[in-house]
């Protein structure tokens, strides 16, 4: 509460229960969204999930198939409708890393095969195994969608999405028979993809970039992560996390090449792009957080929800303003600050993770039969 006093719903007596903790309402088409606008404008919550749409439809471009009538909820980021005890199987393709559509379609083959292969692995829970074997649900995701639309146009985006989806469905029919397993109930998704998209310079998932030609991206690492040791040694700015005692925050300098930032795009265009992805690409869901100017766009929140409630399976919001927060994910910097920071960063010897660094150990979880596992890199 001392670190984030603006969290007006924080209750010291019940620290685990408050807004700002990824809350959503199970809504239905026709919900009175006006009742929630003030809460959304305050801190972005609640979000909305439409189970009726998720159970009835795959892609919104296709006729209702009712295949997902057993769906009981979503994963935390709401890109995957799931049955109780069902797991996510996600893989991602970066739109901005392809020369043409044929190159993109070829990438989808290998992404699909990876996702399908993971569904062949058993888990420790028999009830989960039964559901996974019946559904074979995978989520082949796209990232860089907003920047692709800005550079190549919406007609090209719709074409790539639609042809890509049909190509994956063709692969699934072919390889499911070859593997002697069921075809997947759903095969595509759009996950939020915040940190992963930085690796290829893509805009994250279906979102526009955070804004600014130059900015710092704050990413959290566990204090026992060997990466943290290497980043400190290389000269990256590292701070102790203000909330978690066992976590550190590393600031990465980024030079953006995106044509527009999220501040340049209206609420309606943002939700419209998410609906396009739900219509032409994703037969699971689309993870989207709609940033909006709470001074000028608050009045548009409820109309936008009424307009697109039958075209999305889930949505959340993030009010934007002039207020800044400690260790926020993105913070703008000047060109001079960027160049100064980059000039101080040394080269990282990534092989040190495997070849051995003095006192360098990593503790983490592994896929094993015990409650906790220790992983050491030599």
Segments the model singles out, each with a brief description of its role:
Residues 1-69, 139-167:
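Conserved, charged catalytic cores of large soluble enzymes
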Residues 13-14, 20, 30-36, 41-45, ...:
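Short, well-ordered loop/turn elements at secondary-structure boundaries
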Residues 90-92, 139-151, 192-199:
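Contiguous, well-ordered alpha-helical segments that form the cores/surfaces of helical PPI scaffolds
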Residues 123-135, 182-183:
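Active-site-adjacent structural elements in folded domains
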Residues 167-195, 201-203, 355-362, 367:
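Flexible, glycine/threonine-enriched loop-and-boundary segments that flank and lead into catalytic domains
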Residues 369-376:
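Local cysteine-cluster metal-coordination motifs and their immediate loop/turn environment
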